[in-house]
Amino acid sequence: MKERAAFSHMTEDGAVTMVDVGHKNPTQRTAIVRAVVEVSAATLDLLKHRALPKGDVLTTAKIAGIMAAKRTAELIPMCHPLAISYADVRFEVRDTPPSIALEAEVRTTGQTGVEMEALIAAQTAAATIYDMCKAVQKDIVIRDCRLVFKSGGKSGTFRAE
């Protein structure tokens, strides 16, 4: 059997493979991802007053993000299905510049991390905001989606600066 390359999901000859985590001891793991959805002041006003045609944007985006976290292994080919113990998406509505900052947090006790679940939760929540606001604004921007915190596992704790 060939040794693994530097990328954990690739064999020496370049074939993709799912990492075997069966030998790892379960540990408590957390990942937090942040993103920003930039909208116009007019769109933000409609969002704050729950006056957009599709309804309550932030509640819908929260539910969509949590649902997406639970289905990450169905979307990312080499991602392990996990028993998620906690998932949440939080929002901060900002007037200047007009935007919605969001933070997705996912936790588990398991043999692999939840970074992908948090990324998919944040991206899906952001895309849901876009979907629910696109009737009134087409040039919405989703930006700065990134891992800001991760704990647990062999690599330990990571905090973005």
From Swiss-Prot:
SUPFAM superfamilies: Molybdenum cofactor biosynthesis protein C, MoaC. Its EC number is 4.6.1.17. The active site is at D131. It is an enzyme of class 4 (lyase). It holds the Pfam family MoaC. CDD domains: MoaC_PE. Keywords: Lyase, Molybdenum cofactor biosynthesis. Substrate binds at M78, C79, H80, M116, E117. The keyword Membrane does not apply. It catalyses: (8S)-3',8-cyclo-7,8-dihydroguanosine 5'-triphosphate = cyclic pyranopterin phosphate + diphosphate. GO terms for molecular function: cyclic pyranopterin monophosphate synthase activity. InterPro entries: MoaC (IPR023045), MoaC_bact/euk (IPR047594), MoaC_sf (IPR036522), MoCo_biosynth_MoaA/MoaC (IPR050105), Mopterin_CF_biosynth-C_dom (IPR002820). One of its GO terms (biological process) is Mo-molybdopterin cofactor biosynthetic process. The keyword Cell membrane does not apply. It comes from the Bacteria. Belongs to the MoaC family. Homohexamer; trimer of dimers. This is Cyclic pyranopterin monophosphate synthase. It comes from Nitratidesulfovibrio vulgaris (strain ATCC 29579 / DSM 644 / CCUG 34227 / NCIMB 8303 / VKM B-1760 / Hildenborough).
